[in-house]
């Protein structure tokens, strides 16, 4: 795992990948889960972006642990703000996994079934996708929205705690 990139701590650079891709993956997931036209247009891109975001989380977290060990006397002498940021950062991986799993599930279900908000017809034509009951589509959408909102909220909490750790007590200007 990289600890420095061009002389800078890797965490401060890699975090931008997570900051950008988690919300994008979450937005794509919600759009795909609730809007069939978006799901058709986005296709495999939604789980692909979610997978890259998921892969970036542990790499960034590990780089953050390295940075934590090298800040202000090592991990044993950290101020509470840095410890809080590290603790919150460790909680993002389950949300990233949830976003990826739901993105993959919505993509697979969308390819195999007609995930629309209309009731299923009594008969289907040969060669058409079988329509799932509306309640299944609704459950998938609710779970997709829940993991997306949870992941973005956790990301904001992590970012805020990191900014507080870095900038508290400092002035600009």
Regions inferred by a protein language model and the residue ranges of each:
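Polytopic transmembrane helical bundles with strong interfacial aromatic enrichment
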Residues: 1-173
